[in-house]
Curated annotation (Swiss-Prot):
Catalytic center residues: S517
EC numbers, comma separated: 4.2.1.9
PANTHER family for the chain: D-XYLONATE DEHYDRATASE (PTHR43661), D-XYLONATE DEHYDRATASE YAGF-RELATED (PTHR43661:SF3)
The protein's name in its UniProt record: Dihydroxy-acid dehydratase
Protein species of origin: Rhizobium rhizogenes (strain K84 / ATCC BAA-868) (Agrobacterium radiobacter)
Keywords linked to the UniProt accession: 2Fe-2S, Amino-acid biosynthesis, Branched-chain amino acid biosynthesis, Iron, Iron-sulfur, Lyase, Magnesium, Metal-binding
InterPro entries: Dihydro-acid_dehy_C (IPR042096), DihydroxyA_deHydtase (IPR004404), DiOHA_6PGluconate_deHydtase_CS (IPR020558), ILV_EDD_C (IPR056740), ILV_EDD_N (IPR000581), IlvD/EDD_N (IPR037237)
GO biological process: isoleucine biosynthetic process; L-valine biosynthetic process
Record note on cofactor: Binds 1 [2Fe-2S] cluster per subunit. This cluster acts as a Lewis acid cofactor.
């Protein structure tokens, strides 16, 4: 029987000093021997997805203590990718993932916590905490802050739903007036919560459901809705039960590595492909698998992408559909249910809330259940009132979306496409693979060939696009923006948004060793591995080289013969793998430290410390 980790600091004569300090935090004699649960919050006033979390940690803490545990809260950092976008702030986004994972490990191990509730929400916070949970392997429940309501506005007599990306695209479109841009800007992000489309934050929060580490509704219940409060309360109760199961009954099914097994990672990736999630999820899923010592690679993702159809399209892939619409259709449990009926799910795996995922689906998939709690949960609707307050409204949809032929969520017999929403491409331009969000690619450009327009940084690409250097038919290549070369693997949302604003969204392709925001759509291919800074072929591309992209056949090729490539490689080895033009970029000591250990995207951009 495993002993409570916290006994190290709460029992024995030699721990009198530690107990004295615990007493100074409010603990009493009766608390020593109870499980100490870390409440890992990520409140910050910088990020709309986290601005409402300030009091929610204590909400969970009170429930933990009512259930027989001792709750101790601490905070991690949280970077807003949208605010950090388009300038050197984006260099810090991906590295913050490792800092978050490390900070959780530091706090939990330093104080010998027995279990934890992770209160996350936005882009790097959920992945960082997920990595920490698998690294630590103590009972853990995830509960996120929830998605933002979609913006809604009447423009030129028509009601439209908006999100962050609409504001970015409109601002760069000369055909849209300053007045209309101002209306879009003021309406795009109306409430607290993670941005309203299937961007990285919401994608990752949905994947925690598929991994079995969060409760039904975690990925789709709006931040503003009163129903979301119950998820936080239940997380507090559930984590104490998990802790007691493991430490008092030696039940390893309460542990993250048992729950989030390889089969669960396959489920998460199948969900990601079916819902057309952000390409960033690939990076984070690979990193989390690495932390859990799970053999899950790009080859597994490629295998799944060839089997799983696209069952849902959400903004940015479908501009008029947002997370609130996915929720009305049954949320993630509904998509998982359709995958299960198609034989594409491992349903016999444990979760934090049910003995098996299959049993959970029987209760929470609205296509098959008469469970009143499920039907009530998925009727939670947007309130339509701008606010930064959690649980502040209780609006209900009059009816649920149960249309599996033409609705927001489709069954496997009526998919948006038989090909899934994500694909791994390989070829001489990306020997270790690259990723494209096929759900956001127009069918007319699934096969594309064009001359390379090469840029040595995102900044120069933005200038080139806005100054009309890029024309229809070009393949924009942005290199030296990988984990090591950036450093930090910036998101390329501005270049893709500006291509759209120039009317080139369906007329150009973009390839990079950097990554893309979850808000990106179009023929945008990221994570080219190896990256340029690691000697990848993307560093050998020259202006005008022809590039061939074939998504149906999963290939990406530079039309240059092997002898010429070998000559270019020899010359580049002599010069060093650095950008051809000097960049105005302040690479600090912190960023240099990250770059020194960062691996390419095909390994999740995790750190290679030369050991495991």
């Amino acid at each position: 029987m495993p002993a409570y980790r916290s006994r190290t600091t709460t029992h024995g004569r030699n721990m009198a000093g530690a107990r004295g300090l615990w007493r100074a935090t409010g603990m009493k004699d009766s608390d020593f021997g109870k499980p100490i649960i870390a409440v890992v919050n990520s409140f910050t006033q910088f990020v709309p997805g986290h601005v409402h979390l300030k009091d929610l940690g204590q909400l969970v803490a009170r429930e933990i203590e009512a259930a027989g545990g001792v709750a101790k809260e601490f905070n991690t950092i949280a970077v807003d990718d949208g605010i950090a976008m388009g300038h050197d702030g984006m260099l810090y986004s991906l590295p913050s993932r490792e800092l978050i994972a490390d900070s959780v490990e530091y706090m939990v191990n330093a104080h010998c916590a027995d279990a934890m509730v992770c209160i996350s929400n936005c882009d790097k916070i959920t992945p960082g905490m997920l990595m920490a949970s698998l690294r630590l392997n103590i009972p853990t429940v995830f509960v996120s802050g929830g998605p933002m309501e979609a913006g809604k506005v009447i423009m030129h007599g028509k009601k439209v739903a908006l999100d962050l990306v609409d504001a970015m695209v409109a601002a760069a479109d000369d055909k849209i007036s300053d007045e209309d841009v101002a209306v879009i800007e003021r309406s795009a992000c109306p409430t607290c919560g993670s941005c309203s489309g299937m961007f990285t934050a919401n994608s990752m929060n949905c994947l925690t459901e598929a991994l079995g580490l969060s409760l039904p509704g975690n990925g789709s219940t709006l931040a503003t809705h009163s129903d979301r409060k119950e998820l936080f309360l239940e997380a507090g109760r559930r984590v104490v039960a998990l802790a007691k199961r493991y430490y008092e009954q030696d039940d390893v099914t309460a542990l993250p590595r048992t729950i989030a097994s390889k089969g669960a990672f396959e489920n998460a990736m199948a969900l990601d492909i079916a819902m057309g999630g952000s390409t960033n999820t690939v990076l984070h899923i690979l990193a989390a698998a690495h932390e859990g010592e799970i053999d899950f690679t790009m080859d597994d993702i490629d295998r799944l992408s060839r089997r799983v159809p696209c069952l849902s399209k959400v903004a940015p892939a479908k501009a008029d559909v947002h997370m609130e619409d996915v929720h009305r259709a049954g949320g993630i449990m509904a998509i998982l249910g359709e995958l299960n009926r198609a034989g594409l799910l491992n349903a016999d795996l444990p979760t934090v809330h049910a003995p098996t995922l299959g049993e959970a689906l029987a209760q929470w998939d609205i296509a098959v259940t008469d469970n009143k709690a499920a039907l009530e949960l998925f009727s939670a609707a947007p309130g339509g009132v701008p606010t930064q307050v959690a649980f502040s409204q209780s609006a209900r949809w009059e009816e649920l979306d149960l249309d599996r032929e033409k609705g927001v969520i489709r069954d496997a017999q009526h998919p948006f496409s038989k090909d899934g929403g994500l694909a791994v491409l390989k070829g001489n331009l990306a020997l270790d693979g690259c990723i494209v969000k096929t759900a956001g690619v127009d069918e007319s450009i699934l096969k594309f060939s064009g001359p390379a327009k090469v840029f040595e940084s995102q900044d120069s690409a933005v200038k080139g696009i806005l100054s009309n250097q890029v024309v229809a038919g070009d393949v924009v290549v942005i290199r030296y923006e990988g984990p090591k070369g950036g450093p930090g693997m910036q998101e390329m949302l501005y270049p893709t948004s500006y291509l759209k604003s120039k009317g080139l969204g369906k007329a150009c392709a973009l390839i990079t060793d950097g990554r893309f925001s979850g808000g990106t759509s179009g023929l945008s291919i990221g994570h080219a591995s190896p990256e340029a800074a690691n000697g990848g072929t993307i560093g050998l591309v020259r202006e005008g080289d022809m590039i061939d992209i074939d998504i149906p056949n999963r290939t990406i090729s530079l039309r240059v013969d092997e002898a010429e490539l070998a000559a270019r490689r020899e010359a580049q080895n002599a010069k060093g793998w650095f950008p051809a033009e000097k960049r105005k970029r302040n690479v600090t000591t912190a960023l240099k430290a990250y770059a020194a250990f960062a691996t390419s995207a095909d390994r999740g951009a995790v750190r290679d410390l030369g050991g495991k």
